[in-house]
Structures are given as structure tokens and as C-alpha cells.
Amino acid sequence: MCPSIFVWVPRHRPAHRRSGLRGGEIDDVQGLTGFRRGPAKLRITRRGVTVICVIAAAAVVAVVVSIGVTSSPGANTAKPASSPAATGPGGGVSAGPTTQTTSVAAAATFAGPSGTEAPWVVAENAKPGTTAWKITGTQSPTGIMGYANRVQASDGQSVSLYVSTAAARFHVDAYRMGYYGGKGARLVWSSGQVAGSTQAACPVTPGINMVECKWTQSLSFTVNPTWVQGQYLLELVGSGGQESYVPLTVWDPSSTAAYVVMSGVLTEAVFNAFGGYDLYQGATPCAPNHYPCSTRARVVSFDRPFASGNGAGGYLSLMYPLTRLMEQHGLDVTYWTDITLAEHPNLLGKHKVLISPGHDEEWSNSMRQGAVSGANAGVNLVFFGASPILRKVRLQASPLGADREVVNYRNPVKDPLYGVDNARVSQNWWGQAPANLPASTLVGAKYVGFNNLTSFPMVVSAPSSWLYAGTGLGAGASIPGVMSSDFQAYDPARSANPPNVEVLSHSPVTVQFNPSRHYADTVFYTMASSKAGVFTSGTVNWIPSLVACAASVSNCPATMMRKLTLNVMRVFGAGPVGATYPSTANWQSFYG
């Protein structure tokens, strides 16, 4: 019998509807907070198949290539002292003079053992890292918190921060997230000391229950070439020891990197309950058997802090483990948010694969059109989370800028745009009218439910697939604890399913609030004309499963899941997958 493993549930997830994510006192990103131990241990038992209880570690060595990039601050492992910074417009703090870095487009890419690699990524992660970015203590939600006027920025753009704190003073440390010799981040910039203040309560807009803060700007800085493209955590550090994060993606519109990692900020915003409202719940409890809650918000705003993850939302569990793995292996990556795809769908054709790492339910019409157009032109699509493209939303401006409010009335008839601009009307499901486009027509599987209390093994169903290359896994072998939270499965009853869907794993799961047994599927298919490949994991827990477990957990899935993930990178980063690995329909073996 295998030893016990634990299910971890983020504190902010509503009990009726959010992701149960595994984690622990982990050695890879030790010290992350914002998780609690789930209500029950679960024991993975044998089901007439081989259960992997102890996974042999595979030693993978990243080749470091020096291209003469100058080091930046960040070698320290304690909280860095702030240095004075120049005063920007309006009394804010702006970045001072800094050393220029080599252009990330300067060196050609090459095929490596784990996928398409880029020397600049290898060199960037050879720079001194730091563990000072980790928030390890228990933080008061109101000790220090903030938000930015942008969720993404590029070179030359100004970023304003709006901070409320009980501290007399605070400063900001900007960390680029990656591998950095296992330390996980590099310090790129620090502000000077800024006077702290407690900002006003954030008003709720009647009728739509939107919480949108009207705070005074605390400081600003300008992104310059020292801010290498990537995912950043801006750590707010109060003089009294208060700490929290503000996430920021720095993106490069000129990038032609093989891999686009797209942060699902729309879904993070939709589940952000700061101020008492999100698109799933309101300040008062749901009425019995009434879902979604009638008191929920109809519009949510980025003009407010994230209530969970010490201000980082779900980033550290649902996205960061993939960033860390890809940069450890020097993969040729660039970073977007889903707002990038919504605003610049035409740029997707410059890349080989679009990767949606975590929970990615909320998609706008322009996002979906961009992904479909890209796939029709040969761009591969990877959905590492479950329930992607589940709900149809639209973006609109807030007082701080364009595309900072996310709209979903859930009932399209209640949307003011219904009958006026049906292409932009919000919907509970993409498959309902007026869109009539189920997510499964693109991702190859449908959302079938969730389980936030228990995880289940991922069961191999196509052992000869490229996904399992080099693993030694045979048919019926299982990887413990991978299938959890939201689930996807192939549905043969849907007439518009893509052809040639290949079920790579077919895993028995139990859905909460439904006692019957279901399955969760990892699926893959290729398009006949463009040869693009589409991969869907079938679980929200794929990316969290990349994180090493506590030493006491002997049946940790991390090593095997990293191998599978790198197999996806190797195959999908080489160009249209159908040219080398065309899918072979096998769904009839499971749903015939």
C-alpha cells in the first residue's frame, strides 16, 4: 500500500467551486503561504494496475551558455535594503539609472533535449538569484496591499502602484521569476522608501456588485531594458515587516520565441473576492440550491488587490512551477497574459505554441478567435489546466485604462449587449446561445465537474504516445494525486468534436455533489490541414504536480510530471505536431 499524500486547498477558493491543489512544505518553492491542509488524507490504492509509489529521480542538467550578459542585483538571500530612487511625475518613485542588458533576440535558438532552447534564457538564469522574494510568515490581509494600473507592460511603459498599508513607510522590490540556480527569482529593481497610508474603502457599484478601488497613486516606475521579459512579483515591504505581492507580466511585442506562456489573469480576476464580491459569490451566502449566487458580481475589476496568495492570487501554485521548469531547461519562452491575446491576437502567428498553464475558464471572443486563427495557421495549443474556455466574458475599460474590467452576466439575456452585439455578449457557457460554440470543439474535451476534497491517480491509456517517451510507463500504470479540482473528459455525444481525438490518460474520478463514477481524460489531437496539435491535460492539478513534495511523501508525482511536461515542450515546440506525431483516434476504446 502506498503512503498517504495530502490534498491542499487554497484558502480563497469558495468551497462550492474552486480548485483543490496539492502542495506541502515543498523543497522547490519552500515557504509559500496561502494554503491550508485539506480536510482529509487520501490514500492511493491499487486498482488492478501498477501504482507508482516511488518515482526514481531523473538527473537533468541544464547547459549554461555564457553570452556576456552583465549581472544585475539579486545575489543576496536576505530582504534587500532599499536604495534611493528618483522621484517621478506626480511625486511617485521611478526607476533610476541601470545597466543595460543584452537583447533577448540577439542569439539564435537551438533544439535541446527538452525542447527549443534559447541562449538568453540560459544566461538569464545563470545570473545570481535570491530567495528573498518568499513571504514566509503569516501576514495580515490589511497590513500592506496594492494593485497596479497594468497587469502587463512592455519596454518604455510606466507602471503606477496604488498601495494601502498600516506601515509608516514601505518600499517595493521587483523580482523576475525563474529558476536562478534553484533560488527562484532575481532582484531587478528596488524603489526608495515611500510614505505609507491607509487608503479609502473600495466602493461597490449597485446593481452589478463591482468592487473597484479609487486609491491615490503611491509611486510609479518605467519599464526599461533591464526588466527582461518575464513574469514578475512586485513585493511590497512595509517598515513594520508587512509584505504582499503585486503580479506583473513584462512582455516583448517583437518576440518570436517558440513558446508563449499565457497567464490567465482574467480567471484570477473573476475569482478575486476582494471587497466581498467575485463573479461566483457575493457578500451574503448563496441561497440553497441556487448557483451561481444571485448576489454575485456581474463585473469585476483589476483596480483592486488580489485577496489571496498574499496578493499574488493563484500565480505561485498554478503558473510559477511551469515558469521555473521551463527556465531551468533554458526553453525559448516569452510571456503574455490573456489580455495580450485579447488585444493582439495577430501576434500569435509569430510563435510555435500557445500554453495556458493553470485555471483558465474565462475567454473573450477575441481571445478565442485569436487561438483558432493561430491553430488554423499551424500554431500548437497546450491547455495544462481543466475547464479552459468554459465561460464567455468581455473586457471593458476602468478609470485606470482599457480592458481592466471583466464582464459576465452568466445569463446572456441579462447582458445589456444581448441583441445589440451578440459577438461580445457574456455567457455562462460558451456552448449556449447565442455563441453556440462548446469549448470541446477546440480543446477536445468538455468540463465534467470538480473535486476539491480528493485527488486521484492519472492512469495511462496510450503508453506508446510521445507523451510517455522515456518514462517506462505501460498501459494502466498510474501517477498518484494528479487528477484533482476541475476535470475534463471526452464526450462522444458531442457532434462537433474534433476528429482523431487520442485519449492519452483515462482516469477514474469522483465528482463532488455527484455520487456516480466519472472519468477525467488527457486528450490530444492534430488538425488535418494546418497540422497544429492541441493538448488538454484534463485536470487543474497538472502544474501544481510539478512541485516537489515534502521529504516524508514517498509517492510524489513531481519527477514523473516534469518528464511528461518536458515531453510536451519537446514535441510542441518543434512546430506543427501533426507533421511528426499525427494523432490516432482511440476514444472508441473508452466510449465506444
Model-derived segments and their meaning:
Residues 46-69:
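Secretory targeting and sorting signals
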Residues 165-170, 174-178, 185-193, 240-347, ...:
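Aromatic-Pro/Gly-enriched surface loop or interdomain linker
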Residues 199-213, 219-222, 226-228, 311-397, ...:
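Helical hinge/lid and interdomain linker segments adjacent to catalytic or ligand-binding clefts
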Residues 1-46:
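Terminal targeting segments of Actinobacterial cell-envelope proteins
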Residues 145-168, 174-180, 185-247:
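Ligand-binding face of N-terminal immunoglobulin V-set domains in extracellular IgSF glycoproteins
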Residues 401-548, 557-566, 571-572, 576:
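Glycine-rich, aromatic-lined ligand/substrate-binding cores of catalytic
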Residues 115-143:
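Proline/serine/threonine-rich low-complexity linkers at boundaries of modular beta-sandwich domains
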Residues 62-99:
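C-terminal region of N-terminal signal peptides and the immediate post-cleavage residues
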